Amino acid sequence: MKKIIAFLAMLMMFPTFSFADRNGEEQVTLQKKKHNGAHFEHYAIADMPDAVYYDSGESEIIIVADGTSLYYNVEIVSISLNQTMILTQVDGYGDTIDVSSLPAGSYTIVITSEFLNEYEGQFTI
């Protein structure tokens, strides 16, 4: 029983994430994936031992599990946190956004892709 409680406490230390296509075409939850070498090395982020990501097959959004940064591999038009725009950019695949200075709490992130698909997610630091 103590091991179960300790395990659950450990899980609560990590941010939690969920993502959904706001256009209603696709409902997805980001899956926490263990480092599998080739996948992350392909994007030159092999130092991420554990990450949460959304993968539609065409685009990918990866959030480092400690909540310090966002990594995306999709043509991003804009990113906002709690309705505050933090990035407006029409080009640039594979950029990293540092969110380590954010205070602890819950955040809603909206990512608009080049095809104007909007993805809304929640994460907690």
List the predicted regions and their residue ranges:
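Bacterial Sec-dependent N-terminal signal peptides
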Residues: 1-23
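Transition segment at domain starts
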Residues: 19-55
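Short coil/turn motif common to extracellular beta-sandwich-like domains
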Residues: 54-62
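Short proline/glycine-enriched turn/loop motifs at strand-loop junctions of beta-rich domains
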Residues: 66-72
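Short, glycine-anchored, charge-dense loop/turn motifs used at functional sites
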Residues: 78-84, 107
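Short, surface-exposed loop/turn motifs with a glycine/proline- and acidic-biased composition
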Residues: 91-110
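Beta-strand-rich extracellular modules
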Residues: 112-114
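Edge beta-strands of extracellular beta-sandwich domains
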Residues: 117-125
